[in-house]
Every structure is written in structure tokens, then in C-alpha cells.
């Protein structure tokens, strides 16, 4: 959390940075749950508003799992070490979110898309 704040502080102090022209996306890495990840983000968001007069946009978490720990230990991407790990799947979802320009499926659309993918064995 302190590293993220320090980086944002340096960014906001850079005369070339215009906070009105940029959106800063934040994700919580290695969170035990979505609730924990959101709580960490809320603390960062509060400090950024209070001390930097800025804002950040929450895009979620990368969940902590055994395969992520293993991937970090052997210095390989978790998506290669274990493509089916929770963390790998979340990286994929976040990549799709960013590629789509920040448009997320509603949970109903996402569930239906997953159903069709499994039904027709698409991937």
C-alpha cells in the first residue's frame, strides 16, 4: 500500500502529469478475498483523495493461491505454470477488461457467455 501511494505521489508531483486527463486503474495483488482487496483499495483511495486531491479507479484483485506463490518462487508467469489457477483466470479477465476499454459484462451476460463457451467447448 505504501509503495502504491509513493508511486502515485511521485506521479502527481510530475509537472507533465495532468490528473484531469488520466485515469489511474488500481488492482489489489495477492488478496485473500474480494472483500480484503476492496478494503485495501478503499484505504488507498481515501489517502489519495485526502493528500493528493486525486482519484483512482478500482478494477479488482488478483487472488492469492498456491499456484501464484509457486510461479513467483520459480519466476515464471502463473498463466504458464497453471493456466487453470484462480489467479491465472483473473489475469485473463483483467486483460479482457483492459482490452475492451473498460467495458465489463454484467454478471448475467458473463454467466451466459460462460455457459455457451462450455456448451460449445469454445475457448
In which residue ranges do the predicted regions lie?
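Conserved catalytic-core segment of NTP-binding enzymes
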Residues: 1-60
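Residue-level recognition of oxygen-bearing side chains
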Residues: 6, 67, 86
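A general structural signal for short secondary-structure boundary/capping elements
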Residues: 17, 39-42, 70-76, 104-110
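Short hinge/gating elements
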Residues: 27-29, 74-81
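Phosphate/oxyanion-binding loops and surfaces in catalytic or ligand/nucleic-acid-binding neighborhoods
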Residues: 47, 51, 65, 101
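Beta-strand-loop-alpha "switch" segments that mediate conformational coupling across diverse proteins
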Residues: 52-78, 91
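NTP-binding/hydrolysis catalytic cores, primarily Walker-type P-loop NTPases
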Residues: 77-123
